[in-house]
């Protein structure tokens, strides 16, 4: 499936490349307006800001202190467990690399 996906992606990019090469644009003056990159950046910034505002308002509407406390407790317990098991794993790997002395 991976090779089929790569082949399909390659063909799509190839067709798009030929489309771009086959459609010449009329010459425009560079000082006519803001560059395309600037317009895209402003557009993406606007989308990002609206998404942040929507997520923030949704979070504020659904905020429950009890759930927040449970999430914080689960996070602290899980990070403690992960750090413990990471230490054990590191010790095991180091002892395997050193060998028996």
Swiss-Prot record:
It is found in: Secreted. GO terms for molecular function: phospholipase activator activity; phospholipase binding. Residues 1-22 form the signal peptide. The keyword Glycoprotein applies. InterPro entries: Apo-CII, ApoC-II_dom_sf. One of its GO terms (biological process) is lipid transport. Belongs to the apolipoprotein C2 family. This is Apolipoprotein C-II. It comes from Saimiri boliviensis boliviensis (Bolivian squirrel monkey).
